[in-house]
Amino acid sequence: MRKLSFLVLLFLFFLNACAKEKKEASIIKASNQDLEIVAAYTEAYKALSQGDPYFAAKKFLEAELLFPQSEWAPRSALLASYSYYMQNYYTEALNNLERFLITYPNSKNLVYAHYLIAMCYYETIEGEKKDSAPIYKAKAKFNYISKNFPNTDFALDSEFKLDLIDDILAAKEMYIGRHYIKKGKWIAAINRFKTVASEYDQTVFIEEALHR
């Protein structure tokens, strides 16, 4: 569901721009290079819609290379990253997104790149018993989006994701606190519960933390 919702947001955003570019392409006589990029772009969209995101990523990157100075290039790079994300190739998606931010620092689609980076980290969160690194990286990026791109759908969804992340972090503190209790490390346990009470007081764990 999460991936589908992002796909809808992304495609809605690009729909008008792509339609306008195709209309202009039909009026102006296209060069061979123009035709190549349109063909690659169309093939990539088709592959993505038919459930072959890895091939779609390859074609989007080809489109970017064919016309590096055009508006097609940053869109192609971003959609290639999304295609990797759809295939659960999060490392490839993150690498391409970081390249996107460096290559296209003035792109009007920066919010999408930041959001997709956050989602790549978010998708790798495995719960309170696992590595915390993806949790904090996702939280930092969602916070960045909320502060720097307010009044957008992505900021709204980022705030929702931040609430979910706080639940996970609170659960982690409670898990560690309970573990300390089993070991008889009372002070260490109390400190964990205090963290929940002070930093995650809006989560479902607040009552248990205060009771402890």
Give the label of every model feature segment.
Residues 1-18:
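Sec-dependent bacterial lipoprotein signal peptides
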